[in-house]
Amino acid sequence: MIGPSTEWPALTEYDADHLERVALPIGGIGTGTVSLGGRGDLRDWEIVNRPAKGFVPALGRYGAPFFALYARPEAGPAVLRLIEGPLGVEAYEGSHGSEVRNHGLPRFRDCRFAAAYPLGQVLLSDPEVPLEVRIEAFNPLIPADAARSGIPIAILRYVLVNPGAEPVAAAVCGSVPNFIGADGWNLGRDWRGSPDDSMGPKDNRNVFVEGDGWCGLGMSSAGIDPRAEQWGTLCLATTTTEEVTYRTAWAELSWGDSLLDFWDDLGEDGKLSEREGGDADAPVASLAARVVVPPGDSRALTFLLGWHFPNRRTWQPRAPSAECCAPGGADLDRVGNYYTTLYRDAQDVIEQVVPALGELERETVGFVRAFCDSDLPPVIKEAALYNLSTLRTQTCYRTEDGRFYGWEGCSDRQGCCFGSCTHVWNYEQATAFLFGDLSRSMREVEFGHATDERGLMSFRVQLPLERAKEYGHAAADGQMGCLIKLYRDWQLSGDDEMLRALWPAARRALSFCWIEGGWDADGDGVMEGCQHNTM
């Protein structure tokens, strides 16, 4: 049975009885994530500027994202499988059968999951399949380098292992619907009353693209307003440049026939033939790469999913004005995404990442291995490492100017409790020690923008920053904690320029304790007054 990679560390391995709730977010700081599910599926597509738990984009009843394996031994018939483990029995329950995307497609029988965040491995085998598969998925995480830890990409390597005695002709095929215009929030309903995200996209198009050492399918939209949060680009690519076939759209047929047409086409020889997609608003992009796996050997095929959604809006957008609603009008609530200033579009993400892929993986693995090899108790390693994932979820983001902000957390469909709340973020330590520049940007906002002339620091920061003091309430623990964090960040960085710039506001913030009727009005160093705090 296939095992975890010897090149990647693994802290935890989950067996078949413990996979249902496993989901490893893949994405950069401030970019959103796609999660690798415990069985190898891609779930929780949270890349469109908001949380979207449970969101798996699909074109109506078919076309949800998946990767599939074609395998034909030299002296046997071809086998087709989703590169996923089996569904649980409960997944087939529903008023009209299973609500799980792609539930009717065959899967591998045996599945395990190994992880040491941000490295996730899915281990798949089946006595009826001549190849075993290991999915190796990650997004770069490199301490002290927020830019290279903030890339909007999911890197998925499919390692095909041949335990048999004859060569196996194989192909891995990835399919992703062009769902630009949908974000998992404003869902329509199909005829059964189930959520239907195919109603958001409009006039979306896919095109085959090539670059230096890669090829793939670029996804864009001509029908979505370029100012909308849901507007952007996607790119599904592979670093394999030979034996690659693709579809820019699936055949537009009735009911399940579009899926059957695709399945039969791939199953014939592991190649795809182009189809006429008709006028589908969300055409499915499919990309297949072929390889021959010698007996007793393995081959790896790497796929990349890049994204670029620039139009993030503030925590609590105001009612749109006539000016911003007019053609070409400015959206006064738009704060943007820093990552989209580094890349022109999703295709440019792929173009920049491919030549650096080896280095990005080496540095990520080096960090994770050093941490896993430490003498900390395993439970501490797991808690500390795995909770770094919060930095890369929609809990956190960077506005177009590079500043770092965070919700208190995420609800399933929206951020929960706005404003980089000082008396919640007080208790978070990872950012300062791993990405000091991001932590210092929070201090700059707190003291440079959210603290007024009296020394009152708004413990929730409104955006854009012209509105930073609007909230107008102070929290004792948050305000005092920010003073301690300013000292900590200076100790870690030695940034005298930052400290000098923020020092006057820091003095005012401390003096605020001593105002009449304040937290420590008598100045004895013990807070007796009314104190808004999180305890």
Region spans (language model):
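Acidic-aromatic substrate-binding/catalytic surfaces of carbohydrate-active enzymes
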Residues: I29-R101, C215-D264, D269, G336-T340, ...
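Short, hydrophobic/aromatic-enriched beta-strand segments in well-ordered soluble domains
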Residues: L124, I135-A137, V172-V176, D297-F309
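Intrinsically disordered, low-structural-confidence terminal and linker regions
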Residues: M1-W8, W214
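Polysaccharide-binding surfaces and accessory modules of carbohydrate-active proteins
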Residues: I135, P140-D265, L287, R312-T314, ...
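Internal mixed beta-strand/loop scaffold within catalytic domains of large alpha/beta enzymes
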Residues: W8-R72, A78-G85, Y92-S95, P106, ...
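Substrate-binding groove/exosite segments of carbohydrate-active enzymes
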Residues: T12-P57, G267-V284, R290, D297-L304, ...
